Curated annotation (Swiss-Prot):
Involved in the biosynthesis of isopentenyl diphosphate (IPP) and dimethylallyl diphosphate (DMAPP), two major building blocks of isoprenoid compounds. Catalyzes the conversion of 4-diphosphocytidyl-2-C-methyl-D-erythritol 2-phosphate (CDP-ME2P) to 2-C-methyl-D-erythritol 2,4-cyclodiphosphate (ME-CPP) with a corresponding release of cytidine 5-monophosphate (CMP). This is 2-C-methyl-D-erythritol 2,4-cyclodiphosphate synthase. The keyword Protease does not apply. Binds 1 divalent metal cation per subunit. SUPFAM superfamilies: IpsF-like. It catalyses: 4-CDP-2-C-methyl-D-erythritol 2-phosphate = 2-C-methyl-D-erythritol 2,4-cyclic diphosphate + CMP.
Amino acid sequence: MNTPHIIPRVGIATDAHQVQPGKDCWMACLLWEDQDGCEGHSDGDVVAHAVVDALLSAAGLGDLGSFVGVGRQEYDNVSGERLLRECRELLESKGFVIGNAAVQMVGNRPKMGTRREEAEKVMGELIGAPVSVSATTTDHMGFTGRGEGVAAVATAVVWQAQN
C-alpha cells in the first residue's frame, strides 16, 4: 500500500507600485480613505498582489503576470480580493491546500497598524488560511521612503499530497 506523503512547498514574492495621486487606495483588500492609491492595470493593492504571487510560486504555477496578464480586459482594475479568490480556486483545482501566508508592506502610508487585524481577517477568509500582515518603513530611503511608491514582500506555504 502506498501512503501519500504531504510535501510542504514555500513561495516568496514581491510587488511594488508607484503612488498615483487621486486614485483610491486599496491595500490588503481594504479601502483606505483619504490616502492616495497605487497605479497599475489593477487596483494597485501591492499587499494582495504579493500574496497571490507567493501562493503561485509555492505551487509552481508561475506568477501574477502569467496568471492574469496585463492585456486581458476582464482584469482591468481587478481587485486584490478577486485575485486572491481566483488564486485560491486555481490552487485547489490543482490539488493544493494553502497553509498560511505572511506579507509585509514597505512604505510610509497607509499606516497598516491601525487596521492590521482587519486586513488579516479579510485576506485569511479569501485564501482559506491564516494571513499575517505587518508593515515597515525604510527611514526615508529609496522610492518607498520618499513616498513615491509602496512595496510588499510575501511568503506562503502550500501542501500537495504526493504518492
